[in-house]
Amino acid sequence: MKVTILNGEPTAGSGFDAWVHEVAARARDAHEVQLLELRDLELKGCSGCFGCWVRTPGECVKRDDSALICRAAVGSDLLVLASPLVMGFTTSLLKSAADQLIPILHPYIVIEGGEMHHRARYEHYPQIALLLGQDPGGNAEDLEITTRMWARMARNMKSRLVFSAVAGRTPEEVAYDLAAAA
């Protein structure tokens, strides 16, 4: 199984960062794992220009590292979104990277399950997993809201959220559950 982890931790070497790296190392025992450190990539952010649909179909017109993220996502069986919670939600690094996944869809709209969604650009989309670090001032409701939002994002990206874990579980447990979920 091909696994891509988008690490949205802005601080290298933090406790959450170390946990994500350990989960990746454990997952490598059984799977092909690519760990992308979002803090080290050039991401210019989505401006909503829709150039990725019109001018350069399937690729952001800004020519940043979002193309790397899109290729990695579409080429994976499992896309793991990792972020500590900050003020009750994932980091801006992860949100910005997710916003720049829009080129992997067509601009055309279809009705699915009574809802409007973009048409798929590719035949294969990865399942989505979520690794979260609890906000020191946060609570269970923050985790629930964040998980529901990313589940919705997964649905909009022709996928589904198959797994969610909070830092504190052992990396071995999480790696095992990631493999079982996909």
What does each model-found stretch correspond to?
Residues 1-81, 87-106, 169-182:
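N-terminal beta1-alpha1-beta2 submodule of the flavodoxin-like/Rossmannoid cofactor-binding fold
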Residues 106-156:
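Short, glycine-/small-residue-rich phosphate/pyrophosphate-handling segment
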Residues 76, 82-83, 92, 129, ...:
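Small-side-chain structural scaffolding
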Residues 1-4, 79, 124-131, 160-163:
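Hydrophobic beta-strand segments of well-ordered beta-sheets in folded domains
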